[in-house]
């Protein structure tokens, strides 16, 4: 009872075909195909672009901080 039989699917398919018609479904599938092609083209272009080499880390010179005035007087 909970599963859909083949007759349920046939009725659903018939209703979809009646609502959308052959032309709209064809246009929809064409748009999906164009989207997939565009996505694949974008991914291929992304792979072709040379990766910018990472800049090597630079060492920051350490500067000694001057001692506070109170420590200078004690010495």
From Swiss-Prot:
Part of the twin-arginine translocation (Tat) system that transports large folded proteins containing a characteristic twin-arginine motif in their signal peptide across membranes. TatA could form the protein-conducting channel of the Tat system. Coiled coil: none annotated. Gene3D superfamilies: 1.20.5.3310. InterPro entries: TatA/B/E, TatA/E. The chain crosses the membrane at residues 1-21. This is Sec-independent protein translocase protein TatA. Keywords: Cell inner membrane, Cell membrane, Membrane, Protein transport, Translocation, Transmembrane, Transmembrane helix, Transport. It is a single-pass membrane protein. Residues 43-75 are annotated as: Disordered. The keyword Membrane applies. It is found in: Cell inner membrane. The Tat system comprises two distinct complexes: a TatABC complex, containing multiple copies of TatA, TatB and TatC subunits, and a separate TatA complex, containing only TatA subunits. Substrates initially bind to the TatABC complex, which probably triggers association of the separate TatA complex to form the active translocon. Belongs to the TatA/E family. One of its GO terms (cellular component) is TAT protein transport complex. One of its GO terms (molecular function) is protein transmembrane transporter activity. HAMAP family: TatA_E. It comes from Azorhizobium caulinodans (strain ATCC 43989 / DSM 5975 / JCM 20966 / LMG 6465 / NBRC 14845 / NCIMB 13405 / ORS 571). The gene is tatA. One of its GO terms (biological process) is protein transport by the Tat complex.
